[in-house]
Amino acid sequence: MSGSDGGGLMSSAGLVRYFDAEDQNTIRIDPRTIVATGVMFGLLMLVLNAMIV
């Protein structure tokens, strides 16, 4: 039983290393920008819905 428990950590080690690697070519967006965009989109939908009704 203990032999099957150790495989999970070893199999996920590659994923951890992959996601920990910092790539300089990636797009970096501040999380606050995502939240603000979502709020603005929601408000826009409310305004447009109020104009239609």
Curated annotation (Swiss-Prot):
Residues 51-53 are extracellular. It comes from the Archaea. One of its GO terms (cellular component) is plasma membrane. Keywords: Cell membrane, Membrane, Protein transport, Translocation, Transmembrane, Transmembrane helix, Transport. InterPro entries: Preprot_translocase_SecG, SecG/Sec61-beta/Sbh. Its main location: membrane. Residues 1-30 are cytoplasmic. It is a single-pass membrane protein. The chain crosses the membrane at residues 31-50. The keyword Repressor does not apply. Involved in protein export. The function of the beta subunit is unknown, but it may be involved in stabilization of the trimeric complex. This is Preprotein translocase subunit SecG. It comes from Haloarcula marismortui (strain ATCC 43049 / DSM 3752 / JCM 8966 / VKM B-1809). The lineage of its organism: Archaea, Methanobacteriati, Methanobacteriota, Stenosarchaea group, Halobacteria. The gene is secG.
